[in-house]
């Protein structure tokens, strides 16, 4: 089992500067978001609206990466607002439940979509 977790860490994250400075493998980008592979089966997703999400990382790893992106954040916010979802890998299975997602494999694009959804959940909580 894996976990995807998202945090509201700032009012905004400078995506352009983050892209220029972060050394991780960039897998996806657009004007408002950056999706990185940090290590095998470990991913980080940054959003302009101050959300960062992580896949398959322990609290020490997430804390280190939050420190790494801090220079590109405007108005840091304590990472109290968060959302997490369990991700299970079961061959030939694709299923979404309330607190769990089942995927057929650790596929970066599928993981990105799970992380996008958990991040949007935090954003909705933050702005509601």
Map each language-model feature to its residues:
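Structured inter-helical modules in multipass membrane proteins
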Residues: 109-128
């Amino acid at each position: 089992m894996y976990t995807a977790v998202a945090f509201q860490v700032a009012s905004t994250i400078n995506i352009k500067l983050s892209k220029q400075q972060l050394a991780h493998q960039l897998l996806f980008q657009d004007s408002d978001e950056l999706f990185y592979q940090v290590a095998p089966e470990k991913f980080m997703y940054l959003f302009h609206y101050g959300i960062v999400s992580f896949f398959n990382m322990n609290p020490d790893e997430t804390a280190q990466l939050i420190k790494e992106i801090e220079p590109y954040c405007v108005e840091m916010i304590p990472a109290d607002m968060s959302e997490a979802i369990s991700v299970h890998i079961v061959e030939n299975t694709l299923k979404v439940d309330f607190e769990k997602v089942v995927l057929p494999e650790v596929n970066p694009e599928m993981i990105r979509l799970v992380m996008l959804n958990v991040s949007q959940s935090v954003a909705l909580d933050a702005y509601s």
